[in-house]
């Protein structure tokens, strides 16, 4: 019988447990070793990444682009609050601040603002006392009490110009400049144990991981401020487990290299807090200016809580787009601050009653992406390989933030109306397939300085970065004033046009009949836009109604080569001596055409448009200053005669008269343009604006300039003349050698006392006014000069 040995069951169980424990320990050891090796591998691998990153400045000293300074003048309609807001936005602080701004300081009362530029100001350190009364600047005096005729405020920052072409706005701040309430608000809502943990809050991290598992999706949560900083500086925003490990590794390295205060300072400058136009708002310093129009040191409790609350989802909690959400989130932060003991419950409840008090949202200087692109290009041309980013240069430009806002608003408001016209036309033609909607460009400048004040290069920078303001297109009928200026030049020289017995004037009769020309062996038969022909018309009427055939007829009399030569002198390099040159068949950019029209608006002196005024080091040393280039192209008398003719375009039956119906009433001159594209060029005594509307594929827009470009121009100019700096428009003043005459509308002859009251004003070179009048049309038609020299016929031209 076999011997059976029975092992006690308890002993067997203990042995099994022992074996399992050994296996567990071995596995744990291996896991620990593997984890240590993995951690060591990642630590060593990413230490190099961190080292490389930290060898560079954490925040690159990018070049900063500034707008033009606002000029304040006695008698100007301007509120004290506007000046205060602009000084704060520019970075000026109260002189009693713990750390006054190096840009400058200011102090205000109910009736005055005392401005003192600092060592880093754009201007010299000469201060000014600006006094106000009833919404008007009553006086400006310097530091010695002497009166000033004007004073320029500190230019506003547009953007930082980074090497990777990213569009961010950031104002670097130090930890000492951050209000304690802002620090406590951020800690209360984002990382309450920030000053206690070593970079990773494992309790929150595991809770977030468990939440991911139970919900089946990867959500944010569990990250400390240091982890957020690690992610922002070194990693992409993708949500993967491996990235989280790397994030933790980098977090430990940051914690060991920097103090908590340094980490918070970096976080405060790095965190994204929304979007303004095409620019990202990064850091509390910039956010304080954007949302509240003040320096970060001046933020109150409610403002601190709002900014802290926006960290989680800045666009979702935007006080502009979602004010209710923003207020609710702000109040959540205030409750969190009560929980941490940062504020009392009574203080929090009182603060909750405050409205949002954010600055007016507008498309301001920060929304000039096409302008900024051109500035970047100009800097590259001017400075070559100069590393303006590394040196953190300051680039001062020509941009007027108020006017840029008006330009953008005019485009945004007008495009839907233009698109509707396109849709209606497509419906009438039963068009099938995709519809092409037109692009747009707007250029506004000071006609006396060439300063580009506003520029819009397209309907949406986000959709297309192609800058139509510098894209060449056929100029269409806005070219025609060059033809008439060429004709006035012949009068100035005392030269008769072929077949005429009197010098050219606005009353000269032109043939508006369809005519065939031969160009390079081929027939060219131009037609008027509406297919209507008027027979004999005055030159004034031909330009006022934009008659193609009459204008080409005049160009043929002057000489196509003469017209093309003047066009090239004015800046249209492509112009050639063909009949089509007279109606704008050759290309130029909207920016080019703005330069062309300065000659008409500036007494014949053409000024090249410019955008970069000065490039300086961070300490204020000048690297280069821009000097405008100009050339006298037209005689002042010819410039005025052309302007007077273009004033008529905006009156009565002129093609641009619609701008008056749209509410623009200031004295102005202009010209519509309709070829394949729609144009409008116009100016007052202090502002010139060109608008272009057309298709990228060069197809015919099929909308007149009066219905596509003119409404944008009118909308923009109405806003512009309402601004203090452009409100002082005046009538155009004739120079010496030009006289104004009342002309009878029926006979187109000088009016006398027996004529009807239906008259208009026309400008003439001295001595060229016809001697015949409305009541004596058969009188000697020769002008004064012709009578003296015995030339010409006594009968009027037919």
Predicted regions and their residues:
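Juxtamembrane regions of bacterial inner-membrane/periplasmic proteins
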Residues: 2-420, 428-433, 452-453, 458, ...
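Short, low-complexity, Pro/Ser/Thr/Gly-rich segments in the mature regions of secreted, periplasmic
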Residues: 781-798
